[in-house]
Amino acid sequence: MLTIKDGTLLIHLLLFSVVALVQLQGAKSARAKNPSKMESKTGENQDRPVLLGGWEDRDPKDEEILELLPSILMKVNEQSNDEYHLMPIKLLKVSSQVVAGVKYKMDVQVARSQCKKSSNEKVDLTKCKKLEGHPEKVMTLEVWEKPWENFMRVEILGTKEV
C-alpha cells in the first residue's frame, strides 16, 4: 500500500523524468543544428574538439597527476601480496574523465623497491631505491578520485613485464 509520502516521491520522480527527457531532446536538436557548440577546446589540444564528459588525453608530465602517483602506488601496494613496495619509474600514458570527481586511466612503469612492507614506518615511495635483479613492469590502472571526500579507488586493469 502506498503512503502519501510514497505517492509524492513517485510524482517527483515522474516530473524529473519528463524534465530530463525534454532537456535531452533539446540538447539533441541543438547538437544537430550546431554541433560545434557542444564541444570544448582546452589546453594544448585547442585545434582538436574534446567531448564534454569524455576521456581526454593528458600530459604524463603534468604536475597535478605526478603528485598523485605516490598515493596511487600506495593503493596498488595495499592490493599486492609482494614483500616489497612497488615504486613508480615513469608515467607513460594518462587520460582523464570528469565524473563525480575525476577518473584517470594510466600506464605506469613500476619496479620493485628496496622498501619492505613489513616495516611499520610510513613509506615515502619517492625515497625508495630500485631493487636490482627484478624486471620492471607496466601497470594499466584506473583511478577514481574525489578529493573533497578524501576518496581514491585504484583498480589494476593489467600488468605486463617490460
UniProtKB/Swiss-Prot annotation:
Offer an example of a GO molecular function term for this protein: cysteine-type endopeptidase inhibitor activity
Q: Where is the composition biased (Basic and acidic residues)?
A: 36-47
Question: InterPro entries of this UniProt entry?
Answer: Cystatin_dom (IPR000010), Cystatin_sf (IPR046350), Prot_inh_cystat_CS (IPR018073)
Note the Pfam families from the entry: Cystatin
- GO CC terms of this entry: cytoplasm; extracellular space; vesicle
- The entry's keywords: Disulfide bond, Protease inhibitor, Signal, Thiol protease inhibitor
Q: In which tissues is it expressed?
A: Expressed in the cuticle of L3 and L4 larvae, female adult, and in the eggshell of developing microfilariae.
Placement of sequence motif Secondary area of contact: 97-101
CDD domains attached here?
CY
So which residues are the signal peptide here?
1-32
Site annotation (Reactive site): which residues? G53
User: Organism's domain of life?
Assistant: Eukaryota
Which Gene3D superfamilies does this UniProt record tie to the protein? 3.10.450.10
**Xref: SUPFAM superfamilies:** Cystatin/monellin
Region (Disordered) spans which residues? 30-54
> Is Nucleotide-binding among the key words of this record?
no
Which Cys pairs are S-S linked?
C115-C128
Q: What does this protein's UniProt record list under function?
A: Cysteine protease inhibitor which inhibits members of the peptidase C1 family. In the human host, inhibits CTSL/cathepsin L and CTSS/cathepsin S and to a lesser extent CTSB/cathepsin B which may cause defects in antigen processing and thereby impair antigen-driven T cell proliferation.
Q: Which family does it belong to?
A: Belongs to the cystatin family.
Q: What is this protein called?
A: Onchocystatin
**Species, as recorded:** Onchocerca volvulus
